[in-house]
A protein has these predicted regions:
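TRNA-binding/sensing appendages of the translation machinery
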Residues: 12-38
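Catalytic cores of enzyme domains
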Residues: 3-4, 33-62, 67-195
Length: 195
């Protein structure tokens, strides 16, 4: 077995630290509010979250970004465990009031555009990445699921909830604010990646 020299280990650590700094800097560049690392070994893929998708979300079984198209929870787990790193991020939006449904929809659309920009910045510098975002995909007026392949597979971001992630618990563990206060809405996403 060949061991890395301290200089080689330091070089790899420096590269990893620099990449982490770049990922964080680009998060703020695209106007995300918060970002924090998540220990992939501690991820929990919870059945009840997937059941909530199935029973409470209009996007279930209607999009390539949502269950069942994203695979079983076991397939999602296996997909995630192929990566060495994960960052959870969010964006908090101010609303005009607690019943500002148009503000929520506009914020959701904006968040998806921000995640697209973030992916465009990071994908070229990461060896592999998987971006997860909130709710279903809205890129096309009508999704091709299940009759034909996705029209934009290179831009497809699976839903973070579709992987069975309890966002409240994940945010708390990562030190992110789940609730931004009165008259706000916060959306979450994640990037799993290898350097």
């Amino acid at each position: 077995m060949i061991k890395a020299t301290p200089a080689e280990e330091k070089g790899e650590m420096d590269r990893s630290e620099k990449m982490t700094e770049t990922i964080i800097r680009n998060a703020y560049r695209v106007t995300l509010s918060e970002i924090s690392p998540v220990d992939i070994s501690e991820l929990e893929f919870e059945d009840w979250v997937r059941d909530f998708c199935k029973n409470g979300c209009r996007s279930y079984n209607s999009s390539w970004a949502c269950p069942p198209a994203v695979g079983t929870l076991e397939e999602c787990r296996e997909r995630c465990l192929q990566y060495g790193n994960m960052m959870l991020f969010d964006k908090c939006y101010k609303l005009s009031g607690s019943f500002d449904s148009i503000g929520v929809q506009n914020a959701m659309s904006d968040f998806k555009l921000i995640v697209d920009r973030y992916a465009e910045l990071l994908s070229p510098i990461l060896s592999r990445s998987l971006f997860l975002t909130n709710e279903g995909c809205t890129r096309c007026a009508e999704c091709t699921w299940p009759d034909a392949p996705c029209r934009f597979p290179e831009k497809l971001h699976h839903t973070i909830e579709g992987y069975g992630f309890n966002i409240t618990k994940m945010a708390r563990r990562a030190g992110l604010h789940y609730n931004g206060g009165p008259n706000t809405v916060t959306f979450f996403g994640a990037v799993l990646y290898d350097i």
